[in-house]
Amino acid sequence: AFFRALDPAMEIELLVEDGQAVGPGTDLMRLSGNARAMLTAERSALNTVQHLSGIATLVRDYVRAMDNPACTLLDTRKTIPGLRLLEKYAVRLGGGSNHRMGLWDAAMIKDNHVLVAGSVGEAVRRAVAAGVKEIICEVDRLDQIEPALAAGATRLLLDNMD
């Protein structure tokens, strides 16, 4: 995108697949086009590739460290402005899964909701009663897990638990 934004006729040949592990010095692409456009876009393209490769690599390392197919490593909704889709794609390439794409695809019960509702279970029950299908409940104590699940939470987020 960086190169074609400056030279729509730029020829780009990708030499590796997305998510493919590569070593230092590996050529990732071959470009043919306007030299000024290439040099202008180079740093932005390299920085973006490095950033996304770092995400995919770190996620892959964490997934391997978990060494448990029953566990799923989820990302955060908190991404760099303008890079959400790319960062979430990098997470998937590394073997992780996306937690939420935005605020629209799941309700998240947090400590403020629990405080207003009076309990974790009641906060989840209210979301269920409102017709919410995907309910992620944040818990910070072990005794909150069962009530959250019994009330209908579809996922738990363990917050600051040692």
Model-flagged regions — what are they?
Residues 1-151, 155:
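Acidic/glycine-rich phosphate/pyrophosphate-binding loops and surrounding catalytic core
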